[in-house]
Amino acid sequence: HNVLGHTGEDDAADYLAREGYHILDRNWRSGHKEIDIVAEKGGVLVIVEVKTRRDARFGKPEDAVSENKIRRIVLAADAYVRLYRIDMPVRFDIITVLGKYRQINHIIDAFRTPVWYR
């Protein structure tokens, strides 16, 4: 991870804590899959992908969350829920951190769990 990414994840975690979320894990890994932030609020497990950009010159940060990235996040979330035997609804959010003033945008319920045929 780079310094900018870590700073953005720190900003996102601080923001979530201020908003009443309980941070359960950061940079949780399952093989090659990673969850940036795992949080809980109101009985909902929230899986957060953080995207940090210096500027929007190459598009919005959230546009960098590809279908393949979503699949890896969902698989990591599945591993997390199974490992810790979590029995609560799961929501997937994206938090973007943009620019030198580190403007935060919290996209709640950013994507739904896709179903793949194997």
Give the role of each language-model region:
Residues 1-26:
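Acidic-basic catalytic patches of nuclease active cores, encompassing PD-(D/E)XK
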Residues 16, 35-56, 60-61, 65, ...:
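Conserved catalytic cores of phosphodiester-cleaving nucleases, focusing on short active-site segments
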Residues 28-30, 43, 52, 96:
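Short, glycine/acidic-enriched loop or turn micro-motifs at the edges of active sites
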Residues 30-33, 101:
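Short acidic/glycine-enriched loop/turn segments that link adjacent beta-strands
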Residues 33, 44-46, 93, 105:
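Protein kinase-like catalytic core scaffold
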Residues 57-90:
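Mid-chain, well-packed structural core segment of small domains
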Residues 83-118:
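Domain-level recognition of nuclease-like catalytic cores that cleave nucleotide substrates
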